[in-house]
Amino acid sequence: MPRPFFHKLIFSSTIQEKRLRVPDKFVSKFKDELSVAVALTVPDGHVWRVGLRKADNKIWFQDGWQEFVDRYSIRIGYLLIFRYEGNSAFSVYIFNLSHSEINYHSTGLMDSAHNHFKRARLFEDLEDEDAEVIFPSSVYPSPLPESTVPANKGYASSAIQTLFTGPVKAEEPTPTPKIPKKRGRKKKNADPEEINSSAPRDDDPENRSKFYESASARKRTVTAEERERAINAAKTFEPTNPFFRVVLRPSYLYRGCIMYLPSGFAEKYLSGISGFIKVQLAEKQWPVRCLYKAGRAKFSQGWYEFTLENNLGEGDVCVFELLRTRDFVLKVTAFRVNEYV
């Protein structure tokens, strides 16, 4: 008889609230079986009693949950798999930021490199961070002696990558705010993250001219038909990983520019990102600064260099695909307007 599973990705709110919400779909099926507390059994043999809080047809792991989190050093970005054994008992498997199952005997701080998921779609994407999947227990990978584990060949070793089984289709991002045209005024209360050392000085026409030179050079006379062909070609490409599409505008192509990313994608996958990520085209990677703030994410430093070196211009469509490797990587597939002229 198949056993039900659900997974939870740990967010900052999970840590702050010191509790974990049980997925609604699981609750709707099994709430009558759950008592006032559950037993969480981890592969090291420890059994943790965690109290449940029930309200408005919702259930949280609460009393005792923080002690469980502390014991295994569970952090933001960790992935927890809960296999329901019946009678308010769960088997719990914990995967860390390097996508490996943790070493339960060292409080989760060390990798257990050989305990990886095989590349398989074990999860379904559900709304509100909830997921519930029912599979035979033989599908679920259990800890094995190192000598019995096959070599890591022919499949991705990223456990979390298997979580991303469906695309995120996003509309064209919010236009980049225009640069102020007035001279001699300093922007008050400016967000320090908006400041870029490569931006032009308003009181220097020569600098301002050079600032837009690169964008002008790549500004094309693109007909609506040509643009539509590139967009339609991009729409036929749907990676299995989460992705979004961006149609490049001149405002995304000058030195010092900022490009905002679709909010739906940002909220789901970029929350907490503040620093350099890797953007990959073909076999080469470029460092690009990505900042998430108040539900929005943007590219700044490094983005211009990426577009310049790859000769990306107005009207080109970029499909950004999230690869969950050890580093945070967005793989780019470019559909160029000049290929459809």
UniProtKB/Swiss-Prot annotation:
Record's compositionally biased regions (Basic and acidic residues): 200-211
Tissue: Expressed in roots and at lower levels in aerial parts.
UniProt keyword Oxidoreductase present: no
Chief location bin: nucleus
InterPro entries: B3_DNA-bd, DNA-bd_pseudobarrel_sf, Plant_B3_domain
GO biological process: regulation of flower development; vernalization response
Region (Disordered): 166-223
Protein's cellular compartments: Nucleus
Keywords tagged on the record: DNA-binding, Nucleus, Repeat, Transcription, Transcription regulation
Listed CDD domains: B3_DNA
GO function terms (MF aspect): DNA binding; transcription cis-regulatory region binding
Composition bias type Basic residues, residue spans: 179-188
Record note on what altering residue 289 to E does: Reduced ability to bind DNA. Lost ability to bind DNA
Note, other: Lethal when expressed constitutively.
Protein purpose: Essential protein. Involved in the regulation of vernalization. Acts as a transcriptional repressor of FLC, a major target of the vernalization pathway. Binds DNA in vitro in a non-sequence-specific manner.
Name of protein: B3 domain-containing transcription factor VRN1
Gene: VRN1
